[in-house]
Amino acid sequence: KLAGEKLMPMMAEKTDLAPRLHVLPDFHGNRSPLADPEALGVISGLTLDQSEESFLKLYWATACAIAYGTRHIIDAMNDTGYDITHIHLSGGHTASKVLVKLYADVTGCTVVMSDCEEPVLLGSAMLAAGALDAEGGLARAARQMAGKETTHAPDPSAKADHDRRYAIFHQMHAHRQSLDSMSKT
């Protein structure tokens, strides 16, 4: 939380906080869209600097990498005919203003968050109520039970920097794959 509080003002001043620091976040493999459980994480541009600013830049680059992974999934889905324009976000990521902003800016999607503290549980309750309501069903239950939403639109001024970093993200995937093939005996 402290890192996010320090990063938000920095992100308001410029859209690329670490132009030469890049992360592939696959430290536990890649589930989607590559479906490679053996994929490894990569950090490029790491220095020996131990300052708070250096830590914040690494945190930010890692948060970007998580958002680029989400964009990679959305792009793969859109390439097969979907037209994803909104991300409905719930859970732990909603607590990070940095991630919420990056999801919007990186993907170009509007991020929608329920003001309900537990939106997944609310959705389950809506399904149960809808199943019990023979006349109105799920649609009526959802209308009656839904709370307010908060939306976060992408910042168009961040697009060029994130498009450049996203291209680097893809190049790092290709480099990692090449290095992996050279490393196999």
Model-derived regions, located:
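Activation-segment/catalytic-loop signature of the eukaryotic protein kinase fold
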Residues: 10-122
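Short, hydrophobic alpha-helical segments
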Residues: 74, 125-135
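N-terminal leader/propeptide and maturation segments of large enzyme subunits in energy/redox metabolism
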Residues: 1-5
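Generic hydrophobic secondary-structure packing signal
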Residues: 116-124, 137, 161
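Intrinsic disorder/low-complexity segments enriched in polar/small residues
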Residues: 6-7, 12, 185
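Short amphipathic alpha-helical patches
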Residues: 47, 113, 126-130, 148-152
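Acidic, glycine/GT-rich loop-and beta-edge segments that sit at the periphery of enzyme/chaperone cores
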Residues: 131-185
